Amino acid sequence: MSNDFLICPKCQSKNIQNINARKWFCPDCGFDLYNNVAAAVGLIIEDTDGTLIFEIRAKEPRKGFLALPGGFCDPDESAEQAAFRECREETGVEPSSIKYIASFPNTYIYKEIKYKTCDLFFSAEFTKTEKTIIEQMQGEESEVTGFKSIRINSIDDIDNLPLAFESAHKALKVWFSQNHK
């Protein structure tokens, strides 16, 4: 399914046009609708043993693939607020602090509609406890079927991960280059 309108939502004309996949325009009534990207966040979580923690996705798109905890920013919410909220919702734990890593464009296909996103990635720090971070996690059943700890020793390790989204591969490579010099 394409993201094109068949009729203008304002005047119901069939002359609505998609201009360079950036906006819809109706020459009959002047209606303009820009195809803006949605903001989303992801968190890179390093456990106390040096492994990275990934979610196993419970739903489409890419059900069963690995993902970084995260999700879409809500209206009137900053990327940082979304990162804390999404981590808490999906894992049951909240970071004590986060640090911006990088952002990358992504395409998120949901119910046959393509959503263009700008994914902002953060590394997450947690207060030390007797338990590892993964032992404290409780996944949100509608989002996560479980968690997996994986040791990353090289860029090749990142390339071989069955990640749901390419933007996460790119963010992990930036994180790895910053933390393994």
Question: Where is each model-derived feature located?
Answer:
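Acidic, metal-coordinating catalytic segment for phosphate/diphosphate chemistry
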Residues: 1-43
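Short connector loops at helix/strand junctions that flank enzyme active sites
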Residues: 21, 36-40, 61-63, 68, ...
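Active-site donor-binding loop signature of nucleotide-sugar glycosyltransferases
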Residues: 28, 57, 70, 149-154
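Conserved N-terminal beta-strand and adjoining loop/helix that marks the start
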Residues: 28-52, 69-72, 123
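Beta-strand scaffold of nucleotide-dependent catalytic cores
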Residues: 42, 53-56, 135-136
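Unchanged
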Residues: 73-99, 104-164
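Charged phosphate-binding loop/patch that engages nucleotide di/tri-phosphates or the phosphate backbone
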Residues: 164-181
